[in-house]
Amino acid sequence: MAEKNAKASIRAKALELGFDAVGFAPTAGSGSAQAGNELRQFLEQGCHGDMAWLGRRIDQRAAPTALWPAARSAIVLGSNYGPGDDPLAILAQPGRAAVSVYAHGRDYHDVVKKRLKSLGRWLASDFDCQLKVFVDTAPLMEKPLAQSAALGWQGKHTNLVSRRLGSWLFLGVVLTTLELEPDQQESDRCGSCRRCLDICPTGAFIAPYRLDARRCISYLTIEHQGHIPAELRPGMGNRVFGCDDCLAVCPWNKFAQASREAAYSARPEITDLSLTELAALDDDAFRTRFRQSPLKRTGRDRLVRNALIGLGNAGDASAMPLIESLLDEPSPVVRAMAVWAARQLLDGAAFASLGENRSAGESDPAVRAEWGWEPDSNVPSPESGEG
């Protein structure tokens, strides 16, 4: 009875602090081995791309007790960031910069971590326990834990799906020395549905529940540091930071609710951003504009790279003066995508004229390949692992 009362008190406190979902999971077993094996397979197939850090401390990722042997229970918290409107509508406006819903407001790490620390202080005071808090910053696999804690299940798109809140949940975890009875694990409710798989514009899903990050727009626009493979650029459309397609089409979103968290509210300087405005940012303007935003993690050069791909896909030749000004950028990834965007917007003769007198001054193989001065093999494919 005391344990049940403890769980009820913890749940009530977490909701009071602003969390939208609370569950309790064991720290050993309950899918840990399976999650670890799936991660190893993902890594062995090279599907992680540039994310070499995923291969470090795999045993700790797979089992919370390997990360912290004293842990007896995991309290898994969900923070709803559901959008108030259709996140896919912006894709029909090719001149605008499409940013993933999770980055429309303040950086969620700051919001969730502050609440986790508040919950942790209360737990330590009221229950005399030890604990550690995590929000996407340690080798801990939050989604399998969230499924074990009955917050939802990992859908065919590999993200968590909640019966009550759909696909829009940020996750945080408290590992504690408290012995708390686990909640009953949520079962998979995807059935025969494959909407998330079929909508992917770059074919990133190898199979249901299996993602090749090297083809995923979220990975390419946020994590990938090099040149984006040419065959994947058209599918990016105007997406410059992340992609919500597979999340947004999930039928379980009919139960989703718009977030009540003010910090996640859409900021006009992010949601009303044009591709030309984004591509024109210098480093100082980038840092000022995105100071408290997740967009800051890409750095200015990669975000401009993404915007140039969007401009090439948009087909609006009025962007050419801006694109031409970026042909002499210090960053090779910016120069290369400026060349690619120009090729999309100009006829052959105009493109050739633009490249006159530039060959001698360009040494980067990938940029030269975009001009057509080097073999196309210099532009990496998603399977090559280069770039």
Regions found by a protein language model. Give the residues of each.
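Amphipathic alpha-helical scaffolding segments comprising HEAT/armadillo-like alpha-solenoid repeats
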Residues: A285-R289, D316-D328, L346-S359
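Structural detector for internal amphipathic alpha-helices that build alpha-solenoid repeat scaffolds
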Residues: V304-A314, R335-D347, R368-D376
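Short, charged low-complexity linear segments at domain edges
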Residues: V161-Q185, A213-L232, D282-R287
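Auxiliary alpha/beta "docking" domains used to position bulky ligands
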Residues: M1-R189, G237, S353, S359-P365
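C-terminal amphipathic alpha-helical segment
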Residues: L232-Y264, E277, L281, A285-I309
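Iron-sulfur cluster-binding cysteine motifs and their immediate structural context
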Residues: F19, R195-Y219, R239-A263, L322
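Short inter-helical turns and helix N-cap capping residues of alpha-solenoid HEAT/ARM repeat scaffolds
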Residues: R300, P330-P332, A360-A366
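Glycine-biased, low-complexity coil/linker segments
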Residues: G385-E386
